């Protein structure tokens, strides 16, 4: 079933510095996970949820490689558009480049190094049932200090803390987000963080401040693939669960 009102955005930029020297010659999202390039996984998740109008944001150096690999999107049952991120400036800065593409429509955003088992159809349903709210996916993890961590009270997220030394919960904020079209107004009001980036955590906390952030939990596995240990883990999970892909 086509989810025509929602566009998809895959953020596949960044330097991949934690995967050097492999990323000296290619973008990390083109590295293999199981039998496919990493970028195939978020693409297939979006298409599987009926989202077929998709933007890929990546840097200048390897843009041609993405186009050579993915083309128009026809082979995947979607229509692909590409946007260059001239320099790394944070996840929210990369998302801001999608404003013209989204054109006021709601969107599902996936960080291209997130590998996960569950379908996102349930998340999309929850989002479309309450479209004024943003919606994020959480996953309980053992190493929550590596991620943004959600503080939950009842059925509400009260705060997201970015990479806390002593996490108050083990609920990591994964790189899968649904946003209404006004997310770009929020991004325009952000100030750079201490590392001089526009942080997606600040976007999500802005929605929390006005009680407009919903959430769901992943039941199956989830892994980012931005470090060698997590890349190896993602390969292991995909290999063991090959029928799901």
Regions flagged by a language model, labelled:
Residues 71-77, 151, 206-208:
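Short, conserved catalytic or adaptor-binding loops enriched in Gly and charged residues
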């Amino acid at each position: 079933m086509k989810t025509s009102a929602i566009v998809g955005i895959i953020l596949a930029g960044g330097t991949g510095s934690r995967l050097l020297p492999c990323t000296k010659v290619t973008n990390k999202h083109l590295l293999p996970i199981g039998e496919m390039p990493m970028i195939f996984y978020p693409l297939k998740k979006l298409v599987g949820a009926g989202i077929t109008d998709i933007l890929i944001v990546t840097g200048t150096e390897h843009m041609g490689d993405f186009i050579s690999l993915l083309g128009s999107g026809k082979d995947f049952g979607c229509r692909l558009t590409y946007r260059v991120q001239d320099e790394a400036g944070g996840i929210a800065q990369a998302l801001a480049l999608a404003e013209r593409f989204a054109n006021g429509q709601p969107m599902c955003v996936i960080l291209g190094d997130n590998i996960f088992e569950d379908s996102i159809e349930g998340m999309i349903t929850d989002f479309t049932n309450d479209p004024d709210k943003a919606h994020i996916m959480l996953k309980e993890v053992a190493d929550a200090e590596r991620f943004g961590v959600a503080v939950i009270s009842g059925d509400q997220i009260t705060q997201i803390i970015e990479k806390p030394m002593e996490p108050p919960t083990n609920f990591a904020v994964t790189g899968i987000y649904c946003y209404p079209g006004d997310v770009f107004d929020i991004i325009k009001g952000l100030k750079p963080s201490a590392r001089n980036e526009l942080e997606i955590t600040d976007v999500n906390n802005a929605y929390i401040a006005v009680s407009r952030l919903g959430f769901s939990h992943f039941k199956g596995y989830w892994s980012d693939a931005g470090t060698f240990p997590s890349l190896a883990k993602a390969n292991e999970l995909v290999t063991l669960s090959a029928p799901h892909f």
